[in-house]
């Protein structure tokens, strides 16, 4: 049995949905440079720095993937949603319970949840808005 690469799995999911690159960018709130970076990823660590957990979670939510498929996709980039991390729990909740939510609405919810907690919003917000500061795995 061969293991799919991140790109194989992602573009298979996109193809199954029949979405164009423009539709993916809009649904996942990704700018073109970010999506281009995703398209040209390889499996080395150096290619990961622009594709953070927030960007990957935005793909999962924007594409309305279930939690099982989302976790598989995240794992292919070396990420996992920790049950001990409140931000990861919020992401998990959005994936599991808020199917069809827009990334803008998800970001609004995240902002409300973490306002006043001392969390740096650029490290929480999804899509191209959340990649500037990087992310912890």
Feature map (PLM): residue ranges:
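Short acidic alpha-helix initiation/capping motifs at coil-to-helix transition points
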Residues: 2-4, 13-15, 47-55, 82-87
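DNA major-groove recognition helix of helix-turn-helix/homeodomain DNA-binding modules
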Residues: 51-69
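Long, compositionally biased
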Residues: 61-63, 87-116
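Recognition helix of helix-turn-helix/homeodomain-like DNA-binding domains
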Residues: 29-51, 75-78
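Key DNA-contact positions within bacterial/archaeal DNA-binding proteins
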Residues: 22, 33-36, 68
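Short, charged recognition helix plus adjacent turn
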Residues: 71-99, 121-125
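A short, Lys/Arg-rich alpha-helix, primarily the initiator
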Residues: 1-23, 27, 102-136
């Amino acid at each position: 049995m061969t293991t799919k690469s991140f790109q194989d799995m992602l573009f298979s999911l996109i193809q199954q949905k029949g979405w164009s690159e423009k539709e993916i960018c809009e649904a996942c709130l990704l700018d073109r440079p970010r999506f281009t970076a995703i398209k040209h990823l390889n499996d080395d660590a150096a290619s990961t720095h622009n594709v953070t957990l927030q960007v990957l979670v935005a793909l999962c939510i924007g594409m309305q993937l279930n939690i099982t498929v989302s976790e598989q996709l995240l794992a292919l980039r070396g990420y996992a949603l920790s049950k001990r991390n409140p931000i990861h729990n919020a992401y998990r909740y959005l994936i599991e319970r808020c199917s069809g939510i827009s990334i803008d609405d998800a970001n609004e919810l995240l902002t409300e949840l973490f306002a006043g907690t001392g969390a740096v919003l650029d490290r929480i917000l999804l899509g191209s808005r959340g990649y500037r500061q990087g992310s912890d795995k």
